[in-house]
């Protein structure tokens, strides 16, 4: 095994309080500056790296949700979904 694989850290979870505070911060700004990473890490008792990775993961979750919503909105606007009778294109529901 490579040296990096042997020294891999376990999954570190945030407390409910930390998660709520990170979510509040994300709502204000999804991109933090290095200075803000430091401030948030000290306030929440997490490392700067944990803050940085949490925000990277949260932005990916945000983007995936947005991508899922766009096709649904297009289908709702008269796409190839159900007809007025509620029956799909192949006769099934």
UniProtKB/Swiss-Prot annotation:
The keyword Transmembrane does not apply. GO terms for molecular function: DNA-binding transcription factor activity, RNA polymerase II-specific; RNA polymerase II cis-regulatory region sequence-specific DNA binding. Residues 64-93 are annotated as: Disordered. It is found in: Nucleus. GO terms for cellular component: nucleus. One of its GO terms (biological process) is regulation of transcription by RNA polymerase II. Pfam families: Homeodomain (PF00046). Residues 7-66 bind DNA. InterPro entries: Antp_homeobox, HD, HD_metazoa, Homeobox_CS, Homeodomain-like_sf, HTH_motif. Keywords: Developmental protein, DNA-binding, Homeobox, Nucleus, Transcription, Transcription regulation. The keyword Transcription regulation applies. Its main location: nucleus. Sequence-specific transcription factor which is part of a developmental regulatory system that provides cells with specific positional identities on the anterior-posterior axis. Belongs to the Antp homeobox family. Forms a DNA-binding heterodimer with transcription factor PBX1. This is Homeobox protein Hox-B8. It comes from Sus scrofa.
């Amino acid at each position: 095994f490579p040296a990096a694989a042997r020294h891999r850290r376990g999954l570190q979870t945030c407390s409910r309080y930390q998660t709520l505070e990170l979510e509040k911060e994300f709502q204000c700004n999804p991109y933090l500056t290095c200075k803000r990473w430091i401030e948030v890490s000290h306030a929440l008792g997490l490392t700067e790296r944990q803050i940085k990775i949490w925000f990277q993961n949260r932005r990916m979750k945000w983007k995936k949700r947005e991508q899922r919503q766009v096709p649904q909105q297009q289908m709702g606007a008269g796409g190839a979904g159900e007809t007025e009778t509620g029956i799909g294109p192949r006769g099934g529901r």
